[in-house]
Amino acid sequence: MSRVAKAPVEVPSGVEVTLQGNDIQVKGPKGQMAWSCHRLVSLNQEEGTLTFEPRQQSTRAVALTGTTRALVQNMVTGVSEGFERRLELKGVGYRAQVQGSTLNLTLGFSHPVHYEIPEGVTIECPSQTEVVVKGADKQQVGQVAAQIRGYRPPEPYKGKGVRYADERVVLKEAKKK
């Protein structure tokens, strides 16, 4: 069995896990998530923990067991604590603000960029050059942050653009004559 799958998933208090066949549903203070597990993986629930085992000893089943464990751990963490991704806007006149269910970005284009905030994700702007994406689904939070960054990724000469807060942009040297 994979090293990841050997560790059980601890279910914190306030989080409710329901298993029905291969379907798992997790409810918590930050929301609820449901997912259908692969048939090669069996899930077992004992008081406060979830364990995972492959139904057969094939390479694929063992790999899927570790993947399933990681995804379920992310579901439990998401509904109990949530996930967040921070973005920074670097550049003259680059700013962001939230109006209702739309994120308005001014990124140096001739027009403002309007991003419709999807359901299950909240976006906050603590300052005009900061964007915080929060939600229970780790994949969706990362996807939304990547889409916002994709409007104007950091360019390699001056570093202008939208970047993750923990991202280091390696600047190139300008061409010399």
From Swiss-Prot:
GO terms for biological process: cytoplasmic translation. Pfam families: Ribosomal_L6. One of its GO terms (cellular component) is cytosolic large ribosomal subunit. This is Large ribosomal subunit protein uL6. One of its GO terms (molecular function) is structural constituent of ribosome. This protein binds to the 23S rRNA, and is important in its secondary structure. It is located near the subunit interface in the base of the L7/L12 stalk, and near the tRNA binding site of the peptidyltransferase center. Belongs to the universal ribosomal protein uL6 family. Keywords: Ribonucleoprotein, Ribosomal protein, RNA-binding, rRNA-binding. It comes from the Bacteria. Part of the 50S ribosomal subunit. It comes from Halorhodospira halophila (strain DSM 244 / SL1) (Ectothiorhodospira halophila (strain DSM 244 / SL1)). InterPro entries: Ribosomal_uL6-like, Ribosomal_uL6-like_a/b-dom_sf, Ribosomal_uL6_a/b-dom, Ribosomal_uL6_bac-type, Ribosomal_uL6_CS. The gene is rplF. Gene3D superfamilies: Ribosomal protein L6, alpha-beta domain.
